[in-house]
Amino acid sequence: MIWDKLEPIINRLEDDHTTDDWRRLFDKWAGHTWHDHEAPSELTSVLIVDANAVTTDGTQDLDALHTLLKDHVRSSISDLYLVSLFPHQVKPTDTAVNPRIRLFEDLGRFHDEFDLMYEMTPDVYNELQVDLLDETDAFIERLAQGATKVRVHVQSFRGMPEERIKHVLELWQLILHHYKPHGQLVLAYEGDADRTGSYFEVADVICHFDLASHTLLAFAQGNAKGLTEWADRIEAPGDGKTYFNFLSSPERDPFEKNLLEPSVDMLLAAHSVLFSLQGIPAVDYRTLLGVTTPVERAALVQELKTDPYRLQVFSGILSQLNVKRTHTAFSPYAEQRIVATDKRVFTVERSGGGETLLLYTNVSDDRVVIAASGTNLFTGEWVEAVVLEAYDFMWLKQE
């Protein structure tokens, strides 16, 4: 029984609600039919996409967004992180429809083909002004709406002591795993890096906010030394735990906006860094599709076909993801070792599922040659040396 596991945690919350109030909450969801999905693997990658990104006649249209993603990214990307989704604005109709019911219907098209990730932003003003019962109900509702991953930002618990925050996260993680054993609580934490590891006790995945800044600096300087040293300091997560890696997040500008001259080669090399690291990689739709504001689906498809720059970025990122999906050493749980090769090259060794990969990314505009051999994952050819042109990358399988 879930209550036997939850009661000790709820008692530690010092919440104003009674035990009967909490029991009624879980009784409310007892009749729901829950669907779990596959455990995360090398097949797992996330597209961060604004729920308002695609429009029809200037109005947000989840159906049009679904069609776009189903037709153009489903074969390469497994998960959608739908941001700006709550509260949901339904399309006007002649009949009054409960927005929650309409959202469930709208999202049903997505979770037949993608795993879904939503954000949870607790309505917290200080330790005393928070309704944990109501927030927990909202958390469970996201699971009922198809989420297999829920992102929670620690800083949204304004004024709440860290110990109590961890009790809330412990409660939500237990609820998530009860309803969806393969689900993941994704924690966004931008505090002291030395304290990040302590949150693995109450989360399955922790966001790497520092990756973007270290990657930007590496390309700006043409030197991977700082990026290499940072990555080498990352603690290996425990069993069943991993990281959430991204070059830009919903709260910030797209990665390429911070580059002086973001060439196609530079953007693809940056994504090689992203996909090389242990964890679940997340791609920003603004970078993948080359958009910054809502756009009509037909216009977006036409622009992707006719704009060489956007098409090369789009197809290049998906090409990397397609290779990643076929190698178990890219599992988010596969081992990682940072290798020092050349100061201009970021090098990662990944091992898992009986294979070892060496992943090289040139962050400079120099030509670099490294003494290494293996099978090039993109061409299938054996190479006796790693030859990297400006902003080039090569992924090798060791024999």
Whereabouts are the PLM-identified features?
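Active-site and adjacent substrate-binding regions of carbohydrate-active enzymes
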Residues: M1-S373, T379-E399
